[in-house]
Amino acid sequence: MTAITDIIAREILDSRGNPTVEVDVYLEDGSMGRAAVPSGASTGAHEAVELRDGGKRYLGKGVEKAVEAANTEIFDAIGGIDAENQIQIDNIMIELDGTPNKSRLGANAILGVSLAVAKAAAQASGLPLYRYVGGASACLLPVPMMNIINGGAHADNPIDFQEFMILPVGADSIAEAVRMGSEVFHTLRKELAAQGHNTNVGDEGGFAPGLKSAPEALDFIMKSIEKAGYKPGDDMCLGLDCASTEFFKDGKYVLEGEGRTLESGAMAEYLAELAANYPIISIEDGMAEDDWDGWKTLTDLAGKKTQLVGDDLFVTNSARLRDGIRMGVANSILVKVNQIGTLTETLDAVNTAHKAAYTAVMSHRSGETEDSTIADLAVATNCGQIKTGSLSRSDRLAKYNQLIRIEEGLGPQAQYAGRSIIRG
């Protein structure tokens, strides 16, 4: 009754107006699952490859080849298989592609099918996706890491670091966390406007003011937290995504906005100093993706008290994560479903992290859609943290709204991760 009977993939647009892949998977009993695939602006060199068409259409960014792969070759390989056999289906697609980075069929085609299969199977079983994937123990609502000031590749301003985030650890529920975040977001808007800064929002819904340094951005956020009636370090903590690979040139970190260039050791010391001076509990991609020595230095300096998240470093890849664990590098992994390309491999990365006492953070991409699958996956994996942008843009809010619905559905079972995510 839950055998796959049809796959219909199509080209739709993401939040940046670029094409992406959406897939519908139909089952014998009439159940249907739909998934849309996100894409990133700052991408790690070791990520799975999203297949783009090239040529003039959509300035080379069309995804008709990936759509065709899903509709024909992938369907021919998995049609008739029971959708509940997720691992088997994902492995068939990996083998069918035959490349180490899914570049032949495209990670965008493979992931769209993988997630749609899971959603169809969940519908057939009469369960919400988080319960179908995570089982009876899936009840932990994640602390949202809300990106309210953007820099780097996500904004046209001088700030070197890509994201400055607030984490409402003092909330009692996800609904309260979203309210607290919204209040700080709108307070920050007023503060920026009052000092003559632009309050347009970037790809992920955060502001992109013409500030020059990380401390300047952090000071604005600290003041806004207090003006909104909250206590920094108690009600609200801070997080950074440095995206350091973007400004790592010739073995050095070139902070153009701050007008200085740092050696690897000095960069690690700078980040440790920021974490000591502000209530920063999480730093993502503090060092460049292949600067393993720099990562080790940063981990030794700040890893006991600060969550050090590998995004470009690990690219949701269990093999790279195991390398990091063996070397004592970082202590957390960012989980982006399209970095690895199947649900099975995504869950494996989270499990690998948890077994090594590393944390995992479920994450969106800068190019998103209204698809809210990652909200369910955050709860399914009990990972306790989610990055899904700011408190504006419906492509970001779709995930927050889904978390609110999940919390309501769980009722008294629901637990909010809150301060349990803080290290040290």
Swiss-Prot record:
Pathway: Carbohydrate degradation; glycolysis; pyruvate from D-glyceraldehyde 3-phosphate: step 4/5. CDD domains: enolase (cd03313). The keyword Lyase applies. InterPro entries: Enolase (IPR000941), Enolase-like_C_sf (IPR036849), Enolase-like_N (IPR029017), Enolase_C (IPR020810), Enolase_CS (IPR020809), Enolase_N (IPR020811). Mg(2+) binds at D241, E284, D311. Binds a second Mg(2+) ion via substrate during catalysis. Keywords: Cytoplasm, Glycolysis, Lyase, Magnesium, Metal-binding, Secreted. GO terms for cellular component: cell surface; extracellular region; phosphopyruvate hydratase complex. Pfam families: Enolase_C, Enolase_N. It is an enzyme of class 4 (lyase). The active site is at E204, K336. One of its GO terms (biological process) is glycolytic process. Belongs to the enolase family. This is Enolase.
